Swiss-Prot record:
ATP binds at G310, A311, A312, T313, G314, S315, G316, G317, E318, I319, R320, D321, A686, S896. GO terms for biological process: 'de novo' IMP biosynthetic process. It comes from Colwellia psychrerythraea (strain 34H / ATCC BAA-681) (Vibrio psychroerythus). This is Phosphoribosylformylglycinamidine synthase. The gene is purL. In the N-terminal section; belongs to the FGAMS family. Its EC number is 6.3.5.3. It catalyses: N(2)-formyl-N(1)-(5-phospho-beta-D-ribosyl)glycinamide + L-glutamine + ATP + H2O = 2-formamido-N(1)-(5-O-phospho-beta-D-ribosyl)acetamidine + L-glutamate + ADP + phosphate + H(+).
Amino acid sequence: MIKNLRGAPALSDFRVKKLLAQCEQLQLPVNDIYAEFAHFTKLNEELSTSEEKVLQQLLTYGPTIEEHQPAGLFLLVTPRPGTISPWSSKSTDIAHNCGLAKVERLERGIAYYVTLENDAQLSTSQEAQLNTLLHDRMMESIFNDFAQASTLFASSEPGELTAIDIESGGKNALVQANIELGLALAEDEVNYLFENFTKLGRNPHDIELYMFAQANSEHCRHKIFNAEWTIDGVKQEKSLFKMIRNTHEINPDYVLSAYKDNAAVMVGNKGGRFFPNPETNVYGYNHEDIQILMKVETHNHPTAISPYPGAATGSGGEIRDEGATGIGSKPKAGLVGFSVSNLRIPDFVQPWETDFGKPSRIVTAFDIMIEGPLGGAAFNNEFGRPAILGYFRTYEEEVNSFNGKEVRGYHKPIMLAGGLGNIRDEHVQKREIIVGANLIALGGPAMNIGLGGGAASSMASGQSAESLDFASVQRENPEMERRCQEVIDKCWQLGEENPIAFIHDVGAGGLSNAFPELVADGGRGGIFELRNVPNDERSMAPHEIWCNESQERYVIAVSDKNLATFEQICQRERAPYSVVGRATEEEHLTVTDSHFSDNEKLNTPIDLPLDVLLGKTPKIYKDVKTATAAGDSLDLSTVTLADAADRILSLPTVAEKTFLITIGDRSVTGMVNRDQMVGPWQVPVADCGVTASALDSYHGEAMSLGERTPVALLNFGASARLAVAESLTNIAGTDIGDLNRIKLSANWMSPAGHPGEDAGLYEAVKAIGEELCPALGLTIPVGKDSMSMKTQWEENGEQKSVTSPLSLVITAFGVVEDIRKTVTPELRTDKGDTRLVAIDLSKGKKRLGGSCLAQVYKQLGSETPDVDDAEVLKGFFNAMQTLVRAEKVIAYHDISDGGLFTTVTEMAFAGHTGVDIDISKLSNGANDDLATLFNEELGGVIQIRESDVDAIHAILAQHGILENCTDIGRLNNEDTIRFSRDGEVVLENSRTYYRTVWAQTTYRMQSLRDNPECAQQEHDVKFDTEDPGLNTELTFDINEDIVADLIIRDAVKDAENSANDITNPRVAILREQGVNSHVEMAAAFDRAGFVAIDVHMSDILSGRADLADFNGLVACGGFSYGDVLGAGEGWAKSILFNANARTMFKTFFEREDTFTLGVCNGCQMLSNLKDIIPGSEHWPHFVQNKSERFEARFSLVEIQESPSVLFKGMEGSRMPIAVSHGEGHAEFSSDAAIDAANNSGTVSMRYVNNYGDVTETYPANPNGSVDGITSLTTTDGRVTIMMPHPERVFRTVANSWHPDSWGEDSPWVRMFRNARAFIG
């Protein structure tokens, strides 16, 4: 029985306008579009009246938008029939938790009503264009009436196995299958398979060919990096991979794992890892070695086809790599990067942005940068990993490179996803897989998506059918991955009792690659049952079940002895799992299929020796010739400094990147010390990202990026050397110490096979693997390659192509001794007399080849910057380390893209100050000024105190780089950036002017992607020369610990009592599936003297936990159930409509000796429990931000007079706080309701601007809530809800900016201590 229920409007006015604009662009005759959600319920019996009411309430969620009377062309978009969407599985879980057992399944679609101009009829092609706008054809279907939606719940018989008949068709049958299935097998691999299956005496099955193709794709096996090379007739001694490994052979210090796992591991620091005791669920610090894992991946092919899911699953896959390192570890902080062709922003196309065309199967660079960053950010946000580092480059030009004149660029983009994490020392190495061990799939179900992704990504774009390209893109479900990570966390937290023996993530090739890899790496074979694979698409054929790349999955080996422990953890975390197979002694792979158990031809889809699949497959031999890049001498004779400055600041590579940053959570974990945003004006110019090792430590980790890819169009080796060097100049402002405490990841992107590029790749690898890194004492223990960076197509009968430069992206990971000493580019105006010093590591060279200056004038140049002397680079790094540790440097910024001009202006932007720069000692006259200001030779600029000059000179001299240093200027208070030479001003404009030019890219992209009203408001702020920036005003003593006596009293009592009779007040740190901010919340309450206890909603619903045992309740932030029924609403309804849970919560709220706090998702959840929270009648509903975008900001708030027990004594204080939410807009039912809330005295916190005024203006008010309302309390003050995150900034070092005078505790600790004081 299927029931249809009409839902709320699905699109805001802004989204409708955006859709209409897209229709207009496609010349579709569309006047208007109205869309609303449509819910479909499959019931196993009729609902009662009360159940019907619960279901209706469950499916009423989100913001209040005016309903329309539907009319026009009807299009119903639903998940693809035969599949179960993530929305369906989560909402169905909520329904069951609400007691709706008769609901077999919920599903959701969107009903579109399209009004056409003058009742026009759409042509077939126009219909196809409209359909493409409205749905994702890989995941969704379009129907023309509601009746057709019944097929959503239809199931069909599974597809059958297919044999490839080589017995009668010979090798040609394999050749044909290779083409039809898109396997991307080379001729020698086809021969290999033919020989082996002939020996086995049978025909191969399609599932076996798919599996072989994925496991042996370039993506998975890195054949080019393992190839043997002959260059210009000379056989080379080493493969590319051996040259990379050379760095580890020469310098293995501090490396614990390299080249053999999902990520590399280096030695970290000691600290207190904070997590709950596995037996008692009481949080506590565990002092131990905290080793650092590091990984950087790319997801280029999927991002070119479908940017949002491509980038999302790129981040998700890299996170899984980290979590599956050793026998389980913890991802901590992420990075994201993009290289694309010319952006060509509508109505903002730049003079250098020629349109060279593109094939229809890929999207534009503009589309990639609109959708891709959102996908990467959304996954990190929902998983709960801060993204604190990134890069963005655009390049597309016809240049005279190694193959003569041709178009070089990034039609096949680079989508970089990486990060660092932590792992226990005893978990770095994987354990033995014992014979008979359970081989488990943990995570989401199989779906028919991402088929052939490994093979597809190994081909140059244009070599496969468009349908196969699209089929190879995966789709994301980050909340599922979060659940899986919680399982992994609970396993590693068991220490020696960790039940995981072996773990791999499921990535390219799906289970067909992961399970064979798991058993082969463990020296075992395996026998698997195909139908034990969790499957949401019954109709799939065997090869689709085994080889699809459904995301959020891991494969794990667990012994029988540990299986019960593992299962209990999975059940508590609601993480799906299944025992799919068993490990065998014989290294053989068998997959059975019980569905066809009676059919001998179909019941054993795979029966192969593992060495046929993963053994000595054919090796690649590369015989290549070197080429010379002609280049062109730069003609800049007509270029003015002023025009060059404007163009450089408008080049997306240099321009402001706020639009890529504020969409991503940068504060979750409470351990981020340095994100991209710098200083009181939150300007995105940080050189690196820094995290604390633990919540009780000043030790930490840092990571930085380096890449100079356009240089490779002229000099392969220089480009590679510069990438390594730039990663060092970017990380030099942190307190690392020895250079060998830094380890590198190398990501290589190359158009393999393109004339000159193969020899160039060898030259570049050799340049750093054999030469520069050994000279610096650096190791590259991890990396990845993508060897198909070329796009080909036919246009009007003409063959066209865009080929990327050889692109090496280096990520440096370092161990930080003291995170408090990190120096940023913010010029300080409050440090007395200071000067700026330029450090030039090239000793006066000003080579412009491959520079941004050349690019913005559509040129390339000839001679490029380079690392001319490794000793000078080493001396620079060591000198910086000495200066940073001695706190002699006030501000630091490296010189890179855009040269000295960009470095200085960005520092001025961060410090909101003018500067006077004298280039007399750097420039050789008027004809040299351009090169002086815009060359991209290695170096940096430091701000130092006049009083420290002699001491600093001594340090610079000690490290041999004093002669590389030049005094270049001072700060001014004129809001002017001025460059002079020999007493003459050569370039001058207001800081505000340059700041707004630099901001244009962000402003334009935000205007087209987000609510344009908000984008305009944020841009307007940049014109305010008087803006004081973030500031603080406290009405209490930040250093006073108001509960010190209580904590001492509790400690004495505890010492007198037995270990199991702790008297400290207990606070329930409540989480639901998808919540991700619970650990830092527990740490904040622990700091205030509470016993913080991990409580999952599954504990409440199962009766394992009772709120009667607690003094405090905290509902934490995140994405409960992936916010499928509105932010926090599904969580709330699972309480309201579950009789036992409702009673328990209601009783707790009514107890006068308790307090409750809800933050972010917990705030949204509690706001939906108003029916059972006394005194909350004036609370609003929290809905989508006005910007219609997830907002991660560091915002200023003011504490209001209110009854809140948490804000006692803090009234009138103004201070910054972390904000990270997509649905924080306080929606009241009417103006009268707003007045009632304001008059009730229950508003406890409001957003204010930098002048201290309550504001509704974006971005000071990140969600547009009326009267700046962002926190409320009950009339008795015992229950407080708030959207910002005080728990993430309770440590001063976790604040993106703070006054120098703050100590260990930020002012937000007072809030948690107030809770402790309330309990008494």
